[in-house]
Regions:
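Short helix-loop "hinge" at the ATP-lid/N-box region of the Bergerat-fold HATPase_c
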Residues: 97-98
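Helix-loop junction within the histidine kinase core
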Residues: 28-39
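Short alpha-helical segment of the dimerization/phosphotransfer core of two-component systems
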Residues: 12-17
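Short conserved segments within the C-terminal catalytic ATPase subdomain
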Residues: 58-70
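A conserved beta-strand-to-alpha-helix junction within the catalytic ATP-binding
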Residues: 38-53, 87
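Short conserved segment of the HATPase_c
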Residues: 134-148
Length: 201
């Protein structure tokens, strides 16, 4: 039993180290401007559905309910942008809300599209969780690499401290915005807006 537990701990530590290395490499590419945004057509609803499917298993394993309250007709349309990076942003934020949540908690994803004119629109999505929340002081530094909150319940979770800096950098590259509201012991809400071109074809 002791040997089995030791192997399990070693596997968790190895996975954490691999995640950290991958995040550091990706952040380095962003800072060196070696990441190229796509400009391709994609279906927004399919992208959101794909991201949610990838995260549902992890949520289920942790006893957390992942809900999608998006407006299906609003997001079921073809847009032009960088789907690979938008998907990464959604998955990172969903993973965050799942990781720092409590057994029996919920994570709710909601999205819509707000037309700006005939050619451009805003993809707007919100991720709301019933997790452990964040202190106001930590929120001031959340986009700094390796930012960790070590004096409360978050310290027992193994985060790399790179997820939010990557998310913020990718959103900035696309000319979007992210806002976070959080309350300790209650949960957090992430609101993102990303400008996209409307696919006319």
């Amino acid at each position: 039993k002791v040997a089995r537990e030791s192997r399990a701990k070693a596997r968790v530590a190895a996975n954490h180290l691999l995640s950290l290395i991958n995040d550091i490499l990706e952040m380095g590419k962003i800072e060196d401007r070696k990441i190229t945004l796509e400009h391709v057509a994609f279906n927004l609803k399919e992208l959101c559905d794909d991201a949610l499917v990838l995260c549902k298993l992890r949520a289920s394993d942790r006893g957390i309910t992942l809900l999608n309250t998006s407006e299906p007709y609003a997001v079921d349309q073809s847009m032009i942008g960088s789907p690979t990076h938008i998907r990464r942003i959604i998955i990172n934020l969903l993973d965050n809300s799942i990781k720092y949540n409590k057994h029996g908690g919920t994570v709710t994803f909601s999205s819509t599209v707000k037309p700006l004119n005939d050619a451009h629109a805003l993809f707007c999505f919100t991720i709301e969780d019933t997790g452990i929340g964040m202190a106001p002081e930590f929120l001031k530094h959340i986009y700094e690499p390796f930012a960790q909150e070590g004096d409360d319940a978050r310290s027992k979770f193994q985060g790399t401290g790179m997820g939010m800096p990557i998310v913020k950098s990718l959103i900035d590259m696309m000319g979007g915005t992210i806002e976070i509201s959080s309350e300790l012991g209650v949960g957090s809400t992430f609101t993102v807006q990303i400008p996209l071109d409307i696919d006319k074809n």
